[in-house]
């Protein structure tokens, strides 16, 4: 059993923010893999499904981004899972838009949702960093991160999220390298 977490802020006004791409990824994974509807649990929304032969608990914390770790900790404690069983999908400012990198461990790199997770569960969890690009100047970061995706970005974003969901079985199997390479091939073709 694994716990997959999509980071974002709750509420319709945040739904299309770049900062919510983790929520978007979780939604597409749930849709593609026929997860049942979410239930309110662990200060968030939980879906319990399978990807291949692996049971996946898919959690979208209902706390705001800065408190995401509380929701994740509650789920880990209930299911008696470790941080190593966690995969988190989130926006990465310092990665080009529509690029994806997989990483395990490390610091928060200025991301408040990741900082909260590290505070509550430690840093030994897998991260699926989804690039949103840097706006160029630090004064523009907040507006960029908390801004909606532009209309011109919607089709590439849908393609990216669909590809992440389609290749998610490799993540479930623990094959990060195959996930990354097959994702790149799918997005090229």
Swiss-Prot record:
Main subcellular localisation: cytoplasm
tRNA-binding among keywords: yes
The keyword Oxidoreductase is assigned to this record: no
Protein name: Peptidyl-tRNA hydrolase
A Gene Ontology biological process term: rescue of stalled ribosome
Catalytic site positions: 19
Origin: domain of life: Bacteria
Database matches in Pfam families: Pept_tRNA_hydro (PF01195)
Family designation: Belongs to the PTH family.
């Amino acid at each position: 059993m694994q716990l997959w977490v999509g980071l974002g802020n709750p509420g319709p006004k945040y739904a299309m923010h770049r900062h919510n791409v983790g929520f978007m990824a979780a939604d597409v994974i749930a849709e593609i893999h026929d997860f049942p509807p979410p239930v309110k649990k662990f200060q968030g929304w939980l879906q319990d499904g399978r990807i291949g032969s692996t049971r996946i608990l898919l959690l979208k914390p209902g706390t705001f981004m800065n408190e995401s770790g509380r929701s994740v900790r509650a789920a880990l404690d209930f299911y008696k899972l470790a941080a190593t069983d966690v995969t988190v999908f989130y926006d990465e400012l310092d990665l080009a838009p529509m690029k994806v990198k997989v990483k395990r461990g490390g610091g928060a790199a200025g991301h408040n949702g990741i900082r909260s997770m590290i505070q509550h569960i430690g840093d030994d969890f897998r991260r699926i960093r989804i690039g949103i690009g840097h706006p160029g100047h630090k004064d523009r970061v907040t507006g960029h991160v908390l801004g909606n995706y532009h209309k011109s970005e919607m089709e590439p974003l849908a393609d990216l999220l669909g590809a992440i969901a389609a290749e998610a079985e490799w993540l479930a199997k623990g094959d990060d390298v195959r996930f990354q390479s097959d994702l790149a091939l799918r997005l090229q073709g």
